[in-house]
Amino acid sequence: MASTYSLRQRIALAIVPRLASVAICCLGVTLRYRDVCEPGATPGYDIPPPGVYAFWHRCLLAGAWHFRDYKLTILISRSFDGELIARTVERLGFIAIRGSSSRDGAPGLRNMQRAYLAGHYCAITADGPRGPSMVAKPGVAHLAQLVGAPVRTCYLHPHRAWELRSWDRFLIPKPFSRVTVAWTSPVTPDLPSVQAALDRSMALAQTGNNPQK
């Protein structure tokens, strides 16, 4: 794939992931994460792998630091921006599988299926790669159906953040901010259930209250 990139893009690919991963580490050590769970839910890292997880694209940065130690397998688009993201998160310990839940999605989902069967946590940005923002696409439900697993969702809410004017309203946590990580109980792998769970996780994270306490 690298041969299809322009000289400027190749230079960016050589530099940006290194700088971005260092920046994420410098920011990440200042953040304070706290889990909240709806009834019947458990934080994903307290459940042995494998598992299928969904979250919104706007949560990628906060998630890149928080989930760095779990060898999480994540589906990332084959676009140039996707290549930048893939190389960045791989430097943080993630396993990037190229593809999407739309164009070229079938090979990506098959490789995600193999990762699940090999015992990995598998995650998909449910509204990626191009939106609409916070509207779930069928990719994560299809993956869960392939492997016969439920879908678990989470939302990472920085209490102080910059919100970009991008399609996903991407969130950049401000240094030293708190980040609430909300988890929902597992749902059946169908699109309405996944959308509803993602909506619940966002609402729970933004209120910051744990209904189990």
Task: Identify the residue ranges that each predicted region occupies.
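Conserved H-X4-D acyltransferase segment
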Residues: 20, 24-78, 85
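Short, surface-exposed acidic-centric catalytic microdomains
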Residues: 77-91, 101
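General small-molecule cofactor/ligand-binding pocket signal
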Residues: 34-36, 97, 182
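Short, composition-biased local secondary-structure segments
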Residues: 52-61, 82, 103-117
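Non-catalytic C-terminal accessory region of glycerolipid acyltransferases
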Residues: 2-29, 45, 68, 73, ...
